[in-house]
């Protein structure tokens, strides 16, 4: 608001614009709330972004837990930040790691999401999307926050998880 006013925008126009702004897509985007379980999607795919997102999620969850389905983006990034990913993801209470989203990169021998999961106390490697979704659906409790996290196609799981939670609790 202050910047809009400094740049000469009329105050009423700036306030109307601010009132209609609903945030940026795929950045801590609330996709659904089912039986007190919030399902969020976030584009975070670098350890620093993940740290910030999960720290905020822990506060947002209050007494609830944070359950994450993470899909690393690119083999080269996973190789470069493997330890940092494990540390940042460990902020969450439970983490399911999907296979790496290649984004046109060739696989790197020995680099998989499992190599991150084994560094974590509460990490598990479940490469299949539906099995990963089922694990989260089966383990979520009212008050928990579920986050689909990553720059690949992990966001496609948010509606699957929401529907699964609705079936489980209704």
Give a label for each model feature:
Residues 1-94, 118:
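Nucleotide phosphate-binding/pyrophosphate-handling subdomain across enzymes
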Residues 39-42, 123, 146:
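Generic structural signal for residues in well-ordered beta-strands
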Residues 45, 72-75, 100-103, 151-154:
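Short glycine-rich anion-binding loops that position phosphate/pyrophosphate groups of nucleotides
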Residues 52, 80-82, 108-109, 137, ...:
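Short amphipathic alpha-helical segments
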Residues 55-59, 83-87, 111-113, 142, ...:
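Short, solvent-exposed amphipathic alpha-helical segments in soluble enzyme
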Residues 86-142:
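C-terminal helical cap/extension that packs against the catalytic core
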Residues 97-100, 164-170:
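Short, flexible loop segments at boundaries between secondary-structure elements
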Residues 132-164:
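A glycine-rich beta-strand to alpha-helix segment
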């Amino acid at each position: 608001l202050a910047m809009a006013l400094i740049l000469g925008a009329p105050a009423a126009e700036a306030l109307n614009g601010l009132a209609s702004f609903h945030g940026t897509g795929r950045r801590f985007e609330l996709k659904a709330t089912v039986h007190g379980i919030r399902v969020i999607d976030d584009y975070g795919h670098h350890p620093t972004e993940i740290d910030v997102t999960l720290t905020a999620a822990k506060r947002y969850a209050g007494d609830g837990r944070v359950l994450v389905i993470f899909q690393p983006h690119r083999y080269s990034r996973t190789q470069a930040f493997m330890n940092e990913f494990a540390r940042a993801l460990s902020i969450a209470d439970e983490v399911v790691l999907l296979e790496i989203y290649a984004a046109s990169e060739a696989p790197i021998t020995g680099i998989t999401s499992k190599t991150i999961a084994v560094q974590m106390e509460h990490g598990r490697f479940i490469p299949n999307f539906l099995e990963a979704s089922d694990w989260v659906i089966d383990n979520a409790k009212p008050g928990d926050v579920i986050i689909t996290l990553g720059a690949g196609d992990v966001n496609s799981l948010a509606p699957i998880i929401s529907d699964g939670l609705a079936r489980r609790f209704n």
